[in-house]
């Protein structure tokens, strides 16, 4: 809200004075003596106009000098313009939050553009790992923020239920089933050894007895495929419910083969002369588009590669009417991006349609030590285990608060701590404190009138808190532009910090001064609205008592 207001005022000045339009930053400066907000617009314009940036800054300041939004405007260094905002402008932020309530922060940036976020997608061959958890929360927060900014968002999970990994899963489950019946069967090379398959096998023994003991054929393979897929997918959906995540669409890879989409896309590529046959296989001419080797689409045995079905899947996304799609992948899949871009180009799909957001890996830490082994799965820590230990709120907040491009160390002890050192506790406690203020006011007989006596707000802590309330929409835009949920958690930490400072330094509920109490309760109420809204976008609760 505040950034938009300043940017609009400055843009009008430079358009009138120079006939120019230029992108520039408006942000909170590093030190309070540099004002409430600062801009680099003069330095940006200097390059275009070939003019001294301080001279440009002076001309901008002169044009804005009489504006009641500012107490004063100063020029610093090579040409930074520092704005000291008026109390009137800051109080207007509180008034706006109180009027708009849960609508505050919403803006129609996307204008209804149809976009898709695909994330959490995994081979349904085992439980979600903590790495999947990080991806799910990144996707959830981005989806929520994009909706808040006026986009028509679909959340989708791609189920890799075709291909050799599903056959290996079936063989692994069959081996576990036979082992429980006393028949020694080896898990195939590259198969799945997690204890979760023993649990499924145990259920099967109870349900069907020894019907498929030491028996393997096409019918048995199909039975074990479907059983493993159904049980694991059901378990994955249980985990999604536990973490508070849901998808609009669960899309089956197998369906692309069954409905003819894969063959349709292969035919399109052949007609565009971008495929060829070699060694009995069908290859895509990736090298015609980028400096990379050609890739196999259809193996010599007639089966499709993952690359082929993935191309078909994204072609179908385009045909479903999405203007842009955002796939969220682990950073180990970065090599798949250029060849997918090449495939989209080969199909004449616009360059900006297919987008990938990469995230780094997660390491768990407990008692200062790295957690290396899971008790259940034998080789990885499951998302379920993490949720059981630290709970939904801490899991979601902690995954959101680290830049996706940064390797994450998830501190289990910190996530469980009921102290102000725990970031999610710190923010939630601010919300609980606000609720307690109103209970306290009622007990002390201080009558609350919403929106009244705001003219009494204006000390340093109140100003900082009001300014931070006015930065909410800017934080949401940064999340969307940078694909960085941590921009929202950073904002909430800053807002909570400014509220705790205000709460600690000032008497908010004072029966001897009801009008000032009312003004400060209004500021607290506005803060609570924004804290609750921000936490909701992350999927975290805003408790009234702690």
Curated annotation (Swiss-Prot):
GO terms for cellular component: cytoplasm. Its main location: cytoplasm. GO terms for biological process: arginyl-tRNA aminoacylation. HAMAP family: Arg_tRNA_synth (MF_00123). Keywords: Aminoacyl-tRNA synthetase, ATP-binding, Cytoplasm, Ligase, Nucleotide-binding, Protein biosynthesis. Belongs to the class-I aminoacyl-tRNA synthetase family. It is an enzyme of class 6 (ligase). Pfam families: Arg_tRNA_synt_N, DALR_1, tRNA-synt_1d. Transmembrane segments: none annotated. Its EC number is 6.1.1.19. Monomer. This is Arginine--tRNA ligase. Gene3D superfamilies: Arginyl tRNA synthetase N-terminal domain, HUPs, Isoleucyl-tRNA Synthetase, Domain 1. The lineage of its organism: Bacteria, Thermotogati, Thermotogota, Thermotogae, Thermotogales. It catalyses: tRNA(Arg) + L-arginine + ATP = L-arginyl-tRNA(Arg) + AMP + diphosphate. One of its GO terms (molecular function) is ATP binding.
């Amino acid at each position: 809200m505040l950034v938009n207001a300043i940017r609009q005022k400055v843009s009008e000045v430079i358009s009138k004075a120079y006939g120019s339009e230029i992108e520039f930053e408006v942000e909170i400066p590093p030190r309070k003596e540099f004002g409430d907000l600062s801009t680099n617009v003069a330095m940006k314009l200097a390059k275009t106009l070939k003019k001294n940036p301080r001279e440009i800054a002076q001309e901008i300041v002169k044009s804005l000098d009489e504006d009641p939004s500012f107490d004063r405007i100063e020029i610093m260094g090579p040409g930074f313009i520092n704005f000291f905002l008026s109390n009137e402008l800051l109080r207007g932020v509180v008034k706006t939050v109180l009027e708009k309530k849960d609508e505050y922060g919403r803006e129609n940036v996307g204008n209804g553009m149809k976009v898709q976020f695909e994330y959490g997608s995994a081979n349904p061959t085992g439980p979600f790992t903590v790495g999947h958890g990080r991806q799910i929360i990144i996707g959830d927060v981005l989806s929520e923020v994009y909706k808040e900014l006026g986009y028509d968002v679909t959340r989708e999970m791609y189920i890799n239920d075709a291909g050799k990994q599903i056959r290996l899963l079936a063989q692994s489950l069959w081996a576990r089933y036979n082992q429980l019946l006393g028949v020694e069967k080896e898990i195939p090379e590259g198969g799945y050894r997690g204890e979760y398959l023993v649990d499924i096998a145990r259920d099967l023994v109870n349900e069907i007895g020894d019907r498929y003991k030491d028996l393997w054929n096409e019918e048995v393979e199909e039975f074990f495929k479907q059983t493993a897929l159904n049980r694991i997918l059901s378990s994955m959906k249980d985990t999604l419910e536990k973490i508070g995540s849901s998808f609009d669409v669960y899309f089956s890879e197998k369906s692309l083969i069954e409905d003819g989409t894969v063959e349709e896309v292969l035919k399109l590529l052949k007609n565009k002369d971008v495929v060829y046959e070699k060694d009995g296989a069908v290859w895509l001419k990736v090298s015609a588009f980028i400096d990379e080797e050609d890739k196999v689409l259809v193996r010599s045995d007639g089966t499709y590669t993952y690359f082929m079905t993935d191309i078909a899947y994204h072609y179908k996304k385009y045909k479903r009417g999405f203007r842009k799609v955002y796939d969220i992948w682990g950073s180990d899949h970065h090599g798949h991006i250029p060849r997918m871009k090449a495939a989209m180009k080969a199909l004449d799909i616009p360059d900006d349609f297919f987008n990938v957001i990469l995230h780094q890996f997660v390491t768990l830490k407990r008692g200062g030590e790295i957690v290396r082994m899971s008790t259940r799965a034998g080789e990885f820590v499951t998302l379920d285990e993490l949720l059981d230990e630290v709970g939904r709120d801490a899991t979601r907040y902690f995954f959101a608060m680290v830049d996706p491009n940064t390797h994450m160390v998830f501190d289990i002890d910190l996530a469980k701590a009921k102290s102000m050192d725990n970031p999610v506790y710190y923010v939630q406690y601010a919300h609980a404190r606000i609720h307690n203020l109103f209970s306290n006011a009622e007990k002390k007989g201080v009558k609350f009138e919403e929106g009244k006596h705001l003219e009494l707000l204006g000390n340093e802590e109140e100003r900082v808190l009001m300014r931070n309330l006015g930065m909410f929409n800017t934080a949401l835009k940064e999340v969307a532009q940078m694909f960085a949920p941590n921009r929202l958690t950073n904002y909430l930490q800053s807002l909570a910090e400014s509220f705790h400072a205000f709460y600690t330094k000032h008497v908010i509920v004072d029966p001897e001064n009801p009008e000032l109490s009312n003004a400060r309760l209004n500021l607290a109420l506005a803060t609570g609205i924004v804290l609750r809204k921000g936490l909701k976008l992350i999927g975290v609760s805003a408790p009234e008592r702690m």
